[in-house]
């Protein structure tokens, strides 16, 4: 029922404008709604629907990968050609900044795991975005680096929710579910779109020599998403969608995750408002 409502809301949101003037910049566009709708369809294995909406975005030619990955997150280059939707912040307003930073006392608590850092090839242009840099009294990962405001002690980069690299990797995933096409130069092949993202990162093309099967390609896309989107809120949902959460967490941290933990509990305040388990039961084992 929840996903039915999400799909319905996003289909309704397709009526939104596809652009806004500067005064309304940051509002959700029809393209952003369509991208999230495609991701919802992908999650629910409605591959043909996902393919249709992802292709709609690609053929607009409004979006593209920036040449340098660092420019995507540059505070002086916000709402660039790669961005479909971003939450806007302002460091000069009280409580207007974001929390993607660590205080000096917390700097040892929020570091990236060796598992993630070790996953990057030495030539991968994305690796440097994980490094922390001091700004005023806080440390920020380079992906969200900004100069701390002297008055509010805050930073104010936009938080990117949807960008074109996500569209390309979702499209690669969908095409692979449709058929395993090994022609890396064909726009009907998932390799074509996967390699676009890899090329921007400075990495060589993958071919059927390195990725010899449909299941291997699915793993390759999941791994590319791991390297492309840290700190962007995608990883958990990618693992759940692909059914690999328990396996990946076990391999990385030797932790066994029980099945019921793969979904979150319904907020207790909402359950208590209804106060009727026949109408709104809590998720099992919570």
Task: Give short role names for the model-derived ranges.
Residues 93-112, 232:
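Acidic-aromatic pocket-rim loops
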Residues 104-127:
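Short, cationic low-complexity segments
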Residues 1-94, 125-286:
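Acidic/polar-rich alpha-helix caps and helix-coil junctions
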């Amino acid at each position: 029922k929840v996903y039915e409502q999400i799909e319905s809301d996003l289909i309704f949101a397709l009526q939104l404008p596809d652009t806004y003037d500067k005064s309304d910049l940051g509002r959700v566009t029809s393209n952003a709604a369509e991208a999230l709708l495609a991701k919802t369809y992908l999650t629910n294995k409605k591959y043909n629907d996902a393919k249709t909406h992802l292709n709609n975005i690609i053929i607009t030619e409004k979006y593209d990968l920036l040449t340098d990955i660092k420019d995507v997150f540059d505070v002086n280059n916000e709402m660039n050609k790669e961005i479909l939707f971003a939450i806007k912040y302002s460091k000069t307003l009280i409580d207007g900044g974001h929390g993607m930073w660590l205080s000096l006392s917390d700097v040892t608590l929020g570091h990236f795991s060796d598992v993630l850092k070790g996953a990057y090839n030495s030539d991968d242009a994305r690796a440097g975005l994980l490094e922390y840099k001091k700004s005023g009294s806080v440390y920020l990962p380079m992906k969200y680096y900004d100069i701390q405001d002297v008055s509010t002690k805050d930073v104010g980069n936009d938080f990117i929710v949807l960008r074109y690299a996500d569209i390309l990797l979702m499209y690669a995933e969908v095409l692979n579910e449709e058929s395993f096409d090994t022609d890396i130069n064909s726009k009907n092949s998932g390799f074509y779109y996967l390699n676009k993202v890899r090329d921007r990162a400075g990495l060589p093309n993958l071919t059927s020599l390195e990725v010899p099967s449909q299941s291997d390609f699915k793993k390759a896309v999941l791994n590319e998403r791991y390297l492309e989107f840290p700190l962007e809120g995608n990883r958990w949902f990618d693992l759940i969608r692909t059914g690999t959460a328990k396996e990946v967490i076990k391999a990385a941290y030797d932790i066994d995750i029980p099945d019921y933990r793969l979904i979150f509990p319904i907020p207790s305040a909402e359950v208590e408002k209804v106060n009727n388990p026949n109408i709104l039961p809590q998720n099992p084992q919570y």
